[in-house]
Amino acid sequence: MAEYLASIFGTEKDKVNCSFYFKIGACRHGEQCSRLHNKPTFSQTILLQNLYIAPHNNANQNVANMTEVQAQEIFDEFFEEVFVECESKYGEIEEMNVCDNLGDHLVGNVYIKFRREEDAEKAVKMLNQRWFGGRPVHAELSPVTDFREACCRQYELGECTRGGFCNFMHLKPISRELCRKLYNRSKRRYGGSSRRRRSRSRSGGHRRSRSPKGRGSRR
């Protein structure tokens, strides 16, 4: 029995633990979820909840005449600021991703995966004492370590029918130029780490040629 329970942990067959929280670190039911949200006591990944506010969601931003290029520049500036500050203060970042979803539990979520668990723990402690954009930062350790399982494969293929309210991650891409700049900077600072993986939010290629696989129930 113990072996069976271990094999289904965090899957749709698990009626005790929430598979969405296990895979994505967020669940649309929040504290009202009928299944357990097992918050990790250690992890390489941290979640900064709802940190990014897109221009069209920002009451202080004039978006009437904003072009896609201008919107991308705003996002790139945000991404670079967070990435550079977190890596310089807390430690080497393996990847950083920002959700482009619209659901309250995912909108603007920033996931940062550090190389070391100790750095992630330090980041959570320090960031929870910080403010960003006039709002307090809410940071926590996240169970997400494999973003391939957390991301919507249909979205990556341009086939997601749920739009921004999909319960799997729709990642917002950064520009190719920024991607090269950030990860080359890190490579020079920390050396060529075999464990380093670039952000799945890199530009242009976020819709990959992969066959969609079943995800189970999307509550």
Give names to the regions the model predicted:
Residues 1-219:
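Cys/His Zn-binding finger modules involved in RNA regulation
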